A protein has these predicted regions:
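Active-site-proximal alpha-helix that buttresses catalytic centers in soluble enzyme cores
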Residues: 2-77, 84, 88-94
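Generic beta-sheet signal
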Residues: 5, 110-118
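Short active-site segment of divalent metal-dependent hydrolases/proteases
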Residues: 13, 120-121
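Active-site catalytic microenvironments for nucleophilic, acid-base chemistry
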Residues: 43, 70, 103, 127-131
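Glycine-rich phosphate-binding loop signature in dinucleotide/nucleotide-binding domains
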Residues: 46-48, 104-110
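Short, well-ordered beta-to-alpha junction loops that form the rim of enzyme active sites
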Residues: 55-57, 80, 115-119
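Domain-level recognition of soluble alpha/beta enzyme cores
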Residues: 131-163
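Short, solvent-exposed aromatic-acidic interface loops
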Residues: 164-171
Length: 171
């Protein structure tokens, strides 16, 4: 039974206008982004995360690589966690994320991290809270619900109760 879910936004990517941001593979992590990922790994040390589900984009897979290496975690790449595609309705992102959350809940793991992007993280928070979460105090660059390598912790307290907290922001 899933007890803890960590929603991790990718680290800061390289800013290169010639690389489309919202289509696969997108930009790679910058050196700063790699440092953010290392800080996130440090934060997660001792939190007993058992598995990473990861968007296949360059910036998310490189963030996950740092986490997996430092924490010794297995990784599952899934398009369900990928970036909000150009022209993709947000409801479609929510459907994808709903399927991803179902897979996480059906997995044998109790503590899972998902390395994704701002829009799917917003969709996950809305899904898991039945749209009751107030994200108005959590608006970061690009309108995202977390800064780069920010981590939301969702605790599953019982079948109906969940606690949400933005627990980590890199320095």
């Amino acid at each position: 039974v899933l007890s803890d879910l960590f929603l991790i936004r990718h680290g800061q990517p390289v800013h290169d206008p010639s690389i489309p941001y919202h289509t696969h593979p997108g930009p790679a992590l910058s050196e700063h982004g790699r440092g953010e990922a290392a800080q996130a790994a440090e934060f997660l040390t001792g939190r007993e995360v058992e598995h990473l589900f990861v968007s296949p984009f360059a910036r998310t897979s490189q963030t996950a690589e740092v986490l997996a290496e430092r924490l010794g975690l297995p990784v599952t790449f899934t398009a369900l966690a990928q970036e909000h595609a150009p022209g993709e309705p947000f409801e479609q992102v929510r459907r994808r994320v709903r399927e991803l959350l179902g897979a996480a809940e059906d997995s044998p793991y109790r503590r899972i991290a998902i390395v994704s992007h701002g829009s799917p993280i917003r969709a996950a928070l809305l899904e898991l809270s039945n749209e009751k979460i107030d994200l108005s105090r959590h608006v970061y660059s690009g309108g995202n619900p977390a800064p780069t390598c920010g981590i939301w912790h969702v605790q599953f307290l019982d079948a109906y109760t969940r606690r949400f907290e933005l627990v980590f922001k890199p320095s």
